Amino acid sequence: MENLQLVLFVLGAIAIIAVLVHGFWSIRKQQPKSLKESPMSGFYKDQASVRDSQGFDADGIGEVRVRKEVPATDRQEKEDKPVQEPAFTAAPSRDVEDSRHEQAFALSDEPVQRAARQRQEPVLSMGANAKDDEVQMELGLGQDSQSSLFETVEQESVVEPTPEPEVKAEEPLGEPKDVLVLHVVANEGEELNGAELLPCLLSLNFKFGDMDIFHRHEDNAGTGKVLFSLANMVKPGVFNLDNMEQFTTEGVVLFMTLPCHGDPLMNFSIMLNSAHQLADDVGGRLLDGGREDWSESTKQLYLQRIRAQLD
């Protein structure tokens, strides 16, 4: 038993050592070779030895130059040598004369150039003046056309004010020459109730006003001239608005004076229609001025009376 354990121990140690050796060998194998051992090392050595005509290798690096230090004695001797200044000769005098001659020549040329300019200026000015004249003529024509255009536009834009119609002052009607009368009365044995009568009058555009009676005006809102009026048929013929709920009457009377404001035929038509509507609303009857039943013949008589006033 002890021998078996010893054998197993030895085999395990050998196996471990083999694994370690194999690991180190594989790691060594995977590492890159050094630059010396690489195949490109020879190429780089050859390229380093080859240089161009200026002394630079393939990488653009030149040879290393060692500069020797100059001894102090030689440097001091160079500094002690006097600097020779350039000697000036009399040759520049010719240059001065040449420059003077050039200046004189330039001065002598200026009057000629100025004269030439003066001779050329009138020609240019004449051409410019001619062009200016043409431009001015064109501008003048343009201004004339523009001014005429503006004048026509102004004439068209100016609108003559239309004369306002003269408002003729209304002539006074004077004394009444005729009165057209209509009656709206309750049926026999009945009376008109004020609480029912007032809403009907307001719906017909009557307005309570002067003399404590109702009036029908030109405007439905109750403004303008009075066309006709409505009064109580019972004396004194007035109404009391504060007591309309307790008010009762046998009937009301509608009347229109001639002459009147506006068209009398139109005014009478409005009054007749209002009387018919009021009689229907309160359940009464329509009578003429003589308190007779209204008829078509009576209507024609009223129209004849109106036309007589118009003639």
Curated annotation (Swiss-Prot):
Cytoplasmic compartment residues: 28-311
Residue segments, region Disordered: 46-114
InterPro entries found in the cross-reference section: Cell_div_ZipA, ZipA_FtsZ-bd_C, ZipA_FtsZ-bd_C_sf
Keywords carried by this UniProt record: Cell cycle, Cell division, Cell inner membrane, Cell membrane, Membrane, Transmembrane, Transmembrane helix
Gene3D superfamilies xrefs: ZipA, C-terminal FtsZ-binding domain
GO-annotated cellular components: cell division site; plasma membrane
Membrane topology classification: Single-pass type I membrane protein
Periplasmic domain ranges by topology: 1-6
Alphabetical GO biological process terms: division septum assembly; FtsZ-dependent cytokinesis
Keyword Transmembrane helix recorded: yes
Keyword Amino-acid biosynthesis: no
Domain of life (superkingdom): Bacteria
Transmembrane segments: 7-27
Oligomeric and partner information: Interacts with FtsZ via their C-terminal domains.
Function: Essential cell division protein that stabilizes the FtsZ protofilaments by cross-linking them and that serves as a cytoplasmic membrane anchor for the Z ring. Also required for the recruitment to the septal ring of downstream cell division proteins.
Family per similarity comment: Belongs to the ZipA family.
Name this polypeptide is given: Cell division protein ZipA
Classification of source organism: Bacteria, Pseudomonadati, Pseudomonadota, Gammaproteobacteria, Alteromonadales
